[in-house]
Amino acid sequence: MATKKLHFETLQVHVGQEQADPATDARAVPIYQTTSYVFHDSQHAADRFGLRDAGNIYGRLTNSTQGVFEARVAALEGGVAGLAVASGAAAVTYALQNILGVGDHIVAADNLYGGSFNLITHTFCLLYTSPSPRDTER
């Protein structure tokens, strides 16, 4: 599906599951209620956990339903890939861990959510500044 431009409505329905479910021929994305997956042998497991072979290894890390969701959100937002997390706090943590480093200084609004403020100042131990909106020189 990546070769042709699809309309927004089509992306909502089809991206991430271009073919019907092979086990059931269902058009809708199945919700797999599992946490574990079968490996053909120990080498297969080693390759999966070593990230040499793409595929599911444990339900909290990856699963088919989540993969379709991530692909659809990425397509709808015009992105390359997506990452789904279980909460807003997890999303904030992932975002900050990927853009901030040791000794960085963050500038944010003074009404920043308390959980985010504590994550930045206490967990990450970063400097935090909340300038006045009137102070355009800062």
What are these regions (language model features)?
Residues Y128-R138:
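Single conserved hydrophobic/aromatic residue that forms the stacking wall/gate
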